[in-house]
């Protein structure tokens, strides 16, 4: 399977390292309700590596933390030419979403190889054997969101699929005239899925007109544009490449600014009973 390059633009980590002449001033903050990780702090010296991944580095921007956000991890993966893995994750209980933002990769599962470009989205269920490689002469960058799949007796696991940002028609929120839209890569009524990773789009001036306060944990990576985001009583100026990591019940709202759409990749946990143990 070969896919088509996306018409959308996607922010990448800053990488590199600020010069010694740079005056320290940044927006990063970690609170008991949310973390705000600006693009400017995603430099070379905060990357990591993974077992059995060749010519690859990653920024870890979310991981399960007791008493904070506990359900998922979020990596930004950078795979150099001829890099990748035949053994990407030994945890057979983890499910995966991959969203490509630069370059291209070859994703192999069920005896088929799929060439994914910027804007492609892949869902890989728990227990699936898969491989990923970059055969091109430039690096590939993608988001990798992992969650332990919550098995339910009598409900089958979801099946793997590949789609794209362009292929999914955004759904407008009620009474917003298309100013606030969500691209849903999974049918929200499909109870097999216990996480959704969507793209939310606001046109300039669009807003969330109330403080959303709910049980879902969130990871929000700004793909494009800028705005002001309300988080647990604080207003934060956000722009492409910034990341917001929210625990359950963190109040949130936003107001899109600038002259281009404000778009972010959004993780949330869904469709399961609340655990009655800590």
Per-segment meaning from a language model:
Residues 2-71, 137, 146-195, 277:
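A short, N-terminal "cap"/entry segment at the start of jelly-roll beta-barrel domains
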Residues 113, 126-152, 248-274:
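Ligand-binding loop in jelly-roll beta-barrel domains
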Residues 55-64, 73-92, 183-186, 198-214, ...:
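Conserved short histidine dyad/triad with adjacent acidic residue
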Residues 162-219, 223-229, 235-236:
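Surface-exposed interaction/gating patches
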Residues 110-126, 233-248:
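Short acidic-glycine-tyrosine-enriched beta hairpin
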Residues 76-80, 90-107, 199-203, 213-231:
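Short, conserved beta-strand element in jelly-roll/cupin
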Residues 2-25, 29-32, 210-213, 217-224, ...:
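C-terminal functional regions that serve as terminal interaction/effector modules
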């Amino acid at each position: 399977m070969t896919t088509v390059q996306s018409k959308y633009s996607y922010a990448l980590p800053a990488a590199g390292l600020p010069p010694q002449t740079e005056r320290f001033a940044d927006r990063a903050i970690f609170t008991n309700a949310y973390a705000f990780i600006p693009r400017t702090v995603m430099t070379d010296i905060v990357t990591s590596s993974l077992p059995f991944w060749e010519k690859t580095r990653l920024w870890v921007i979310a991981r399960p933390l007791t008493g904070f956000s506990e359900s998922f991890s979020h990596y930004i993966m950078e795979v150099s030419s001829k890099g990748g893995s035949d053994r990407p994750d030994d945890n057979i209980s983890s499910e995966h979403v991959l969203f490509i933002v630069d370059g291209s990769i070859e994703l192999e599962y069920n005896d088929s190889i799929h060439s994914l470009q910027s804007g492609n989205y892949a869902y890989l269920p728990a227990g699936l054997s898969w491989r990923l490689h970059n055969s091109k002469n430039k690096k590939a960058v993608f988001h990798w969101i992992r969650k332990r799949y919550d098995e339910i007796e009598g409900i089958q696991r979801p099946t793997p699929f590949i789609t794209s940002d362009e292929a999914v028609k955004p759904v407008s929120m009620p009474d917003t005239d298309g100013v606030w839209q969500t691209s849903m890569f999974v049918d929200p009524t499909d109870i097999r899925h216990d996480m959704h990773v969507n793209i939310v789009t606001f046109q300039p001036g669009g807003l969330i007109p109330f403080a959303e306060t709910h049980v879902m944990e969130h990871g929000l990576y700004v793909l494009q544009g800028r705005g002001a985001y309300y988080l647990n009583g604080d207003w934060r100026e956000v722009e492409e490449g910034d990341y917001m990591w929210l625990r359950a019940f963190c109040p949130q709202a936003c107001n899109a600014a600038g002259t281009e759409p404000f778009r972010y990749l959004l993780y949330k946990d869904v469709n399961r009973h609340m655990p009655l143990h800590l």
